[in-house]
Swiss-Prot record:
This is Probable dual-specificity RNA methyltransferase RlmN. Signal peptide: none annotated. Disulfide bonds join C105-C341. It comes from Oceanobacillus iheyensis (strain DSM 14371 / CIP 107618 / JCM 11309 / KCTC 3954 / HTE831). [4Fe-4S] cluster binds at C112, C116, C119. InterPro entries: Aldolase_TIM (IPR013785), Methyltransferase_A (IPR040072), RlmN_N (IPR048641), RNA_MTrfase_RlmN (IPR027492), rRNA_lsu_MTrfase_RlmN/Cfr (IPR004383), rSAM (IPR007197).
Amino acid sequence: MSKSSIYGLTYEKLKDWLIEHGEKRFRAEQVWNWLYKKRINSFDEMNNVNQSAIQLLKDNFVLHTMGEEIRQESQDGTIKFLFKLEDGNLIETVLMRFHYGLSVCVTTQVGCNIGCTFCASGLLRKSRDLSSGEVVEQIMNVQKHLDERGEKDRVSHIVVMGIGEPFDNYNNLMDFLYTVNDDRGLNIGARHITVSTSGLAHKIYEFADDPIQVNLAISLHAPNDELRTKIMKINRAFPIDKLMKSVDYYLQKKNRRITYEYIMLDDVNDHKKEAIELANLIKNHRHLAYVNLIPYNTVDEHIDYRRSKSENIQAFYETLTELGINCGVRWENGADIDAACGQLRSKQIKKSKAV
């Protein structure tokens, strides 16, 4: 049986585990500091921890559960990493550079079962969930890459928008969030972390009840059930009415802004009537709503879909703003590399099968 990732333990779980195995309470703080502040690559680097404790950790945990398979760097500084896991599966992680800091997009599952008809991630069905340690390790790998390049900046923002549905891996997601948010370690502010869901309403209720104050984004992509079901199979299980009731509960509990993600598909969901429907759908909580219009990244396997024309994106944006909806257009990072979610992984798997 393979050893677990040390990054899979929250601070409290690490402390409890060490005490259970005969170590003093302070040992957790020492180890945590080495993991997240000094970012060690070997347990042997912990020079203020006794050898018996180091051996205990080495016998039960590992620091590395994945290796870098491919790295693509864009002219705009975006870096896409393809990591190979211990079981041979591939996942993607993306570093994006913004004026406000460095943001990392992490993956939570190997493959995806949500079934969005326009997305590269769903071309390969979900084979398993990632452990919380595997999600944390993505952040650590990116930060260590920056350290090795001599970059002094640290990862300041996280978006959980990579391959998979985060709320379908809920417990591991929450351990990940508490680990990266912990002020004794990476200390990434909750307001700098965004979790995106395709709309698992029952998990939105659960997320609303959790005290952590991270941001929520909903991949909406259509303002009515007929169209949303056509492009997102998840809408059969969680139609818009059920989804919006969970949103109401979330807003009541958190009083925090929700971002609605809306992919712009040419002649599919980009007409004025959809803009009006969308505005009407969220008008009752528009003071806590923001719409992110996302120009579509073309995927070879989905030839039926094209990016909306620039003038249609602009018209959609103007209609929403005229109706009092806060919105913006999110132009992609890494346009010259395989930066659309799932593209690089899909290409590499196809290439491997062709050999």
